Amino acid sequence: FKDEAEENAVRGAAYFQRAYRYYKLTHLFGDVPYLSQEIETPKVDFYTYDRWSILEQMEKDMEFAYQWVPEKVDRGKPSKWACGVLLMKVCMSLGHFDRAIEIGKEVVAANPLMTERFTTNKTKPNTNLMHDLHSVEAKMDMSNTEGILYVVSYPEVEGRDRINTMRNATPYWANGSIKTPDGKTGMSIVPASEAKGTELDNDANVGRGIGTCRPTNYYQYDIWTEKEKNDLRGVYNRDSWKGVFDLYYNAPALKGTEWYGKHPVKPVGMSVSDSIRCWFQWPHYKTFVPDPSVTTDRRGGETPWYIYRSAEVYLMLAECYYWKDMKQEAANMMNVVRQRAGAESLAASDINIGTVLDERARELYYEENRHVELSRISYVYALTGKACEVFGGHVYKLDNFSGPEGTSVNCKDAGVNFYFDWVSAKN
């Protein structure tokens, strides 16, 4: 190393990688083995460490990283600001909300939201700022100030891979279950030759989905209220979200019939199993990833993907203020994100943990590690003893976190931890 700064930058980047994984492990499994040094010989006697002690060590490590890792790094590497986001999450896990707020303010000041249209997509019809922000081009555009940490994958990069979101997140519209009202097969992957590249080309326009990642009703309906009528991220915006009812009957055999070129009508006799995978709506603006190398059976090509961006930091700031009972400040932070999207502003009286989680769902769909964040919030409720408004003022406790039978068994009863109650209510 040429100097202390270079050495500490490398050490800080390594600390990030370790803390990133332990942050997830401690919220997925609780107490886990902790490695403080490289394992150079076979070892079979690992023992778990207390999760709180691990998080305290991660906080120290990430304070070091936040000090020494540079602000400007190659795309895909952790920067000072990525270290700040992770440090903020660890601080929140430990109930250190004042420090988390201090860091969060620094991060968003250095990484402002993208509020104007950008990239070459900005002139495309039927698109908006959300399409720009989540396009392949935006994640490769160095003028994008909002992106903080990315998975890097694009053509000619070693280790690249296709994302397959158009396959997994799009309904299974081509499996033969979607029929015309008179019972004929309605949709085809390969349209008639004159329909290719037109609005009738469902494969080109949304991808050949198989519906393995269907949104729950919570994501499709519950979180989109009257206050989100003009939200660019939501189901009311039919450029941003698509449903099977936005596609077209395009089977070549239908040419000359009254249904050819019409929007699908949900078959009355469609089974529940078919409707689960074949008939739903999804956030097209996030999942549409064109692949120039294919001309049919489009699944979603190579693209970078956000791990951290400053919109999440605003929502983390809002959550910190919620824990501190500073509801107006929480609303202010959430409204920065909501106003950018076109949603109505929230008042202090609207704020509770449900409001925070709903906004995370709207903004961070397919980005946040939802299970991990719900687990973190569950631990914070038990750590702080704060009454949970969305569940009748219930107070959770650490000494009963996994249920009355002790910490070695799974929770099977409501009212034991927030995670169980939230998932039971929303899923």
Region locations from a protein language model:
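An aromatic- and glycine-enriched ligand-binding surface/loop that stacks and positions planar moieties
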Residues: 91-260
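Conserved, well-structured interaction surfaces
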Residues: 1-29, 45-52, 62-75, 287, ...
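C-terminal substrate/ligand-recognition segments
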Residues: 211-337
